[in-house]
A protein has these predicted regions:
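Exported/periplasmic ABC-transporter solute-binding proteins
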Residues: 32-71, 75-79, 90-100, 108-113, ...
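Periplasmic-binding protein-like
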Residues: 84-87
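Cleavable N-terminal signal peptides
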Residues: 19-21, 31
Length: 263
């Protein structure tokens, strides 16, 4: 009888142990999942927004993404903030690599975008095919919006110089709404301003807007956005797997659908 009782207890213990092993096995992917911190220019917001679910479900990792202007992100990194992955302009990443804040040899070009003019969907599209016609269109607009140069938005800094080159900076001040980050498209969509100036990808990402086109002639400027792995990354392999998705055919298709050309 004691032998039978012992056998039943042994079997019960084995069953409990097996159940625990199954439970631990099921929990293993979550236990070893990496949390990948990304510091990204707002220009990649639409692309990362669409790719995040695919990355997280495919890798089991979790993305934490901080979006801001390149200038503000650079300030934070210079002040000592770290990230697993940084998506910024190529010159800024090259500088951070020189400083030792981006891992050597990890920088990869992801996409190209250009500063564009946008209007509300369905609204007449102004002729901006030459510098002179752009000047006429800007002067005729009731209101425009672009990123505040003082906040470091790359498109805003550049467009302020364009207004100077066109000789209409003072004339445009009274009808210009300066915004932080990439909000010009939202003001256009809401009807708060007639015309917005931003990265084409930022305008295209806002429902209710349409991209008229890039700045014409020698006013045209194209920006290359690149990605690099932080030298202090806790999981470089997890960070690299996101780079691989961004540069894959799937990533390229998403970039293109968001108004950006694969690099």
């Amino acid at each position: 009888m004691m032998r039978g009782l012992f056998s039943r207890r042994t079997a019960l213990a084995a069953a409990v142990e097996y159940s625990l092993l199954l439970a631990l096995g099921a929990a293993a992917p979550a236990a070893y999942a990496a949390e990948v911190k990304v510091m990204s220019t707002v220009a990649l917001t639409p692309t990362l927004g669409e790719l995040t679910p695919e990355y997280e479900s495919g890798s089991g990792n979790k993305l934490t993404i901080i979006y801001n202007t390149i200038a503000d992100l650079k300030k934070r990194i210079d002040a000592g903030e770290t990230a697993d992955l940084m998506i910024l302009s190529r010159p800024v990443l090259d500088d951070l690599q020189t400083q030792g804040k981006v891992a050597q040899g990890s920088i990869v070009n992801v996409g190209r975008s250009y500063v564009a003019i946008g209007v509300r969907a369905g609204a007449p599209q102004p002729d901006i095919s030459t510098a002179e016609k752009l000047k006429v269109a800007l002067l005729a607009a009731k209101s425009i919006s672009y990123a505040d140069p003082a906040k470091g938005g790359a498109s805003g800094v550049y467009f302020a110089k364009v207004l100077d080159r066109l000789g209409i900076a003072d004339q445009m001040k009274s009808k210009t709404v300066l915004v932080p980050n990439a909000q010009a498209g939202e003001l256009v969509a809401n009807g708060e301003v007639e015309m917005g100036v931003a990265q084409a990808s930022e305008i295209a990402a806002v429902p209710g807007t349409q991209v008229v086109g890039p700045l014409p002639g020698d006013l045209h400027i194209e920006m290359i956005f690149s990605v690099g792995i932080g030298s202090m990354s806790k999981d470089p392999a997890a960070a690299k797997s996101l780079i691989e998705l961004l540069t894959s055919p799937t990533g390229a298709a998403v970039l293109k659908s968001k108004g950006m050309d694969p690099a």
